[in-house]
């Protein structure tokens, strides 16, 4: 009885003072994925995938876009009468064209190398329209009769504003020889065309000469065109067709024209006064009177995130497009509040998900810290040094990832003519392949970084635990749940010394040794008692078994079941 009382007294003494190492927990339900696990609940996380836009066309860095409304690029450059609002346009940040604009080539035909011209425009921010061959400078040809009902203006027949359709005059079409020398310091975009009549009668009616040609030459261009006379279906009321061409005339270079019919001469050209990043974006959106750094056909993106999944085509300083629906980067710890007692999977270091069973919602001023209890009370205290180092480390890592992924680029649609469909299909397959690879890389990066972040937190908790363990040594007992029981009295000053790393082991070692030996002695004495009882029990059992065997043998001998010889 005395031993039992002594044991209870010692147990109550040892249990009194404790210090535990733990980590922060909160009410967060946000989940992340790692290489090893899915749907890991964490205390803090950062979404790095932008999914929202404003649904508007905006200025890009303060520069308005050129929104062509119902006009196409061809209609704008040639001067479709329905596109007069774009006769002179200011600097633009990007060009917006509808998928099927109504005001294209009003007189039916083709625009040669149209896709290449659009690609050129993706590197231009401003044109200045200049007159190179005045309409009044054709005294031997009709320069005002070249109009068509296909290009109406105010209910009357008209024609493209920037070129002149030359017709015979007084039943004659003298051979044209005309040159223009580019004396500007800028490159010049020059446009001209040829008319393909419906039949020979129309050819004679308009140009008098049955066999005509157009020759165009520069230092880099040598072109000779002849009309293709053929019966065709009517488009916009016209059986004839027009084909338009363009070239870039360098400074101090000259363009020379020679023709005896079917010539659509340039009147205006475009001086390229500013080059820069631009794009031709297909979109049906309206202008939103807003400003952005990143524009997509779906709307503007204002985000510092490194990825987005809104549209693969962008202009400006944009996040990278990925096909993912979710990219969440862990910044905090595994969120396992103490009330949630079920065992979680272990992290690399086994700290948070291993020997420590749940976080503390009561510790709100740090990621890692302590909980102590002694005669003076109990309380939580964050380890601010390790917490700050962890915050700095995670913040630097997140910023580094964003910086690496934020290499700005533009992705604009490429257009191909009908003869290049196989190239277009190959290009789409290549772009889809690049997007698939980039999406995979982004998702893998997030999984790996989340694994590293959670292991980083596990390691920090384990390091804090080891810091305490190495200080206390045998002055305290490890309980296996992140806590230590002192073999000596540890007041608040003592607790504080453990937390800040100044614990004086020798000061408490003698008291701890005595208490430790006293507890060990009780255990040994109890062990001896148990051993004696075990021996007595074994001997008694053996004697009882021997007596039973002897009695059974005598009974069998007496009734003849067993022969007994002496």
Curated annotation (Swiss-Prot):
<feature type="disulfide bond">
    <location>
        <begin position="490"/>
        <end position="494"/>
    </location>
</feature>
<keyword id="KW-1170">Fusion of virus membrane with host endosomal membrane</keyword>
<dbReference type="GO" id="GO:0016020">
    <property type="term" value="C:membrane"/>
</dbReference>
<protein>
    <recommendedName>
        <fullName>Hemagglutinin</fullName>
    </recommendedName>
</protein>
<dbReference type="GO" id="GO:0039654">
    <property type="term" value="P:fusion of virus membrane with host endosome membrane"/>
</dbReference>
<keyword id="KW-0348">Hemagglutinin</keyword>
<keyword id="KW-0812">Transmembrane</keyword>
<keyword id="KW-1168">Fusion of virus membrane with host membrane</keyword>
<keyword id="KW-1133">Transmembrane helix</keyword>
<keyword id="KW-1161">Viral attachment to host cell</keyword>
<keyword id="KW-0472">Membrane</keyword>
<keyword id="KW-1162">Viral penetration into host cytoplasm</keyword>
<feature type="disulfide bond">
    <location>
        <begin position="106"/>
        <end position="151"/>
    </location>
</feature>
<feature type="glycosylation site" description="N-linked (GlcNAc...) asparagine; by host">
    <location>
        <position position="27"/>
    </location>
</feature>
<feature type="glycosylation site" description="N-linked (GlcNAc...) asparagine; by host">
    <location>
        <position position="39"/>
    </location>
</feature>
<feature type="topological domain" description="Cytoplasmic">
    <location>
        <begin position="553"/>
        <end position="566"/>
    </location>
</feature>
<feature type="disulfide bond">
    <location>
        <begin position="71"/>
        <end position="83"/>
    </location>
</feature>
<keyword id="KW-0946">Virion</keyword>
<feature type="glycosylation site" description="N-linked (GlcNAc...) asparagine; by host">
    <location>
        <position position="181"/>
    </location>
</feature>
<feature type="disulfide bond" description="Interchain (between HA1 and HA2 chains)">
    <location>
        <begin position="20"/>
        <end position="483"/>
    </location>
</feature>
<dbReference type="InterPro" id="IPR008980">
    <property type="entry name" value="Capsid_hemagglutn"/>
</dbReference>
<keyword id="KW-1043">Host membrane</keyword>
<feature type="glycosylation site" description="N-linked (GlcNAc...) asparagine; by host">
    <location>
        <position position="500"/>
    </location>
</feature>
<dbReference type="InterPro" id="IPR000149">
    <property type="entry name" value="Hemagglutn_influenz_A"/>
</dbReference>
<dbReference type="InterPro" id="IPR001364">
    <property type="entry name" value="Hemagglutn_influenz_A/B"/>
</dbReference>
<keyword id="KW-1164">Virus endocytosis by host</keyword>
<dbReference type="GO" id="GO:0019031">
    <property type="term" value="C:viral envelope"/>
</dbReference>
<comment type="similarity">
    <text>Belongs to the influenza viruses hemagglutinin family.</text>
</comment>
<keyword id="KW-1165">Clathrin-mediated endocytosis of virus by host</keyword>
<keyword id="KW-1167">Clathrin- and caveolin-independent endocytosis of virus by host</keyword>
<comment type="function">
    <text>Binds to sialic acid-containing receptors on the cell surface, bringing about the attachment of the virus particle to the cell. This attachment induces virion internalization either through clathrin-dependent endocytosis or through clathrin- and caveolin-independent pathway. Plays a major role in the determination of host range restriction and virulence. Class I viral fusion protein. Responsible for penetration of the virus into the cell cytoplasm by mediating the fusion of the membrane of the endocytosed virus particle with the endosomal membrane.</text>
</comment>
<keyword id="KW-0325">Glycoprotein</keyword>
<dbReference type="GO" id="GO:0055036">
    <property type="term" value="C:virion membrane"/>
</dbReference>
<feature type="transmembrane region" description="Helical">
    <location>
        <begin position="532"/>
        <end position="552"/>
    </location>
</feature>
<feature type="lipid moiety-binding region" description="S-palmitoyl cysteine; by host">
    <location>
        <position position="557"/>
    </location>
</feature>
<feature type="lipid moiety-binding region" description="S-palmitoyl cysteine; by host">
    <location>
        <position position="564"/>
    </location>
</feature>
<keyword id="KW-0564">Palmitate</keyword>
<keyword id="KW-1015">Disulfide bond</keyword>
<dbReference type="GO" id="GO:0075512">
    <property type="term" value="P:clathrin-dependent endocytosis of virus by host cell"/>
</dbReference>
<dbReference type="GO" id="GO:0019062">
    <property type="term" value="P:virion attachment to host cell"/>
</dbReference>
<feature type="topological domain" description="Extracellular">
    <location>
        <begin position="17"/>
        <end position="531"/>
    </location>
</feature>
<feature type="disulfide bond">
    <location>
        <begin position="294"/>
        <end position="318"/>
    </location>
</feature>
């Amino acid at each position: 009885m005395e031993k039992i009382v002594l044991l209870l007294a010692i147990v109550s003494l040892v249990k009194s003072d404790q210090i535990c190492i733990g980590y922060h927990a909160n009410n967060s339900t946000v989940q992340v994925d790692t290489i090893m696990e899915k749907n890991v609940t964490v205390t803090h996380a950062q979404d790095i995938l932008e999914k929202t836009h404003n649904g508007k066309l905006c200025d890009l860095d303060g520069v308005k876009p050129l929104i062509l409304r119902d006009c196409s690029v061809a209609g704008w450059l040639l001067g479709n009468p329905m596109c007069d609002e774009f006769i002179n346009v200011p600097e633009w940040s990007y060009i917006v064209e509808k998928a099927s604009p109504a005001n294209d080539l009003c007189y039916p035909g083709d625009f040669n190398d149209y896709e290449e011209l659009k690609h050129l425009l993706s590197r231009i921010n401003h044109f200045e329209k200049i007159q190179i061959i005045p309409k009044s400078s054709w005294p031997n040809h009709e320069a005002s009769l070249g109009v068509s009902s296909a290009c109406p203006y105010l209910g009357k027949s008209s024609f493209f504003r920037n070129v002149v359709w030359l017709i015979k005059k007084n039943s004659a079409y003298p051979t044209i020889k005309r040159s223009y020398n580019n004396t500007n310091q800028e490159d010049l975009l020059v446009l001209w065309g040829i008319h393909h009549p419906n039949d020979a009668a129309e050819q004679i009616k308009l140009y008098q000469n049955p066999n005509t040609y157009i020759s165009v030459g520069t230092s880099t261009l040598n072109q000779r065109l002849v009309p293709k006379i053929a019966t065709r279906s009517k488009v916009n009321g016209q059986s004839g067709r027009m084909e338009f061409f363009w070239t870039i005339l360098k400074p101090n270079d000259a363009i020379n024209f020679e023709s005896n019919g079917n010539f659509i001469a340039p009147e205006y050209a475009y001086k390229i006064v500013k080059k820069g990043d631009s794009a031709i974006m297909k979109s049906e959106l309206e202008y939103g009177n807003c400003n952005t750094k990143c524009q997509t056909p779906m709307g503007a993106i204002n985000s510092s995130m490194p990825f987005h999944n809104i549209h693969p085509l962008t202009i400006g300083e944009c996040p990278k497009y990925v096909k993912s629906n979710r990219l969440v980067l862990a910044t905090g710890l595994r969120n396992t509040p103490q009330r949630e007692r079920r065992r979680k999977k272990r992290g690399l270091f086994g700290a948070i998900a291993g020997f420590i069973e749940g976080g503390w919602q009561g510790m709100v001023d740090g990621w890692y810290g302590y909980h102590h209890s002694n005669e003076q009370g109990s309380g939580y205290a964050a380890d601010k040094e390790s917490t700050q180092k962890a915050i700095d480390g995670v913040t630097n890592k997140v910023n580094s990832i964003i910086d690496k992924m934020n290499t700005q680029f533009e992705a604009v649609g490429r257009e191909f003519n009908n003869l290049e469909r196989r190239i277009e299909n190959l290009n789409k397959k290549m772009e889809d392949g690049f997007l698939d690879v980039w999406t995979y890389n982004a998702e893998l990066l997030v999984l790996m970084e989340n694994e590293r972040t959670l292991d980083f937190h596990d390691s920090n908790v384990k390091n804090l635990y080891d810091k305490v363990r190495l200080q206390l040594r045998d002055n305290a007992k490890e309980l296996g749940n992140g806590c230590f029981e002192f073999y000596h009295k540890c007041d608040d000053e003592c607790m504080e010394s453990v937390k800040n790393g100044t614990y004086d082991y020798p000061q408490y070692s003698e008291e701890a040794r005595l208490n430790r030996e006293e507890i060990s002695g009780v255990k040994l004495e109890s062990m001896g008692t148990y051993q004696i009882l075990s021996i007595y029990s074994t001997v008694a059992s053996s004697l009882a078994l021997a007596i039973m065997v002897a009695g059974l043998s005598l009974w069998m001998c007496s009734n003849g079941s067993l022969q007994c010889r002496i």
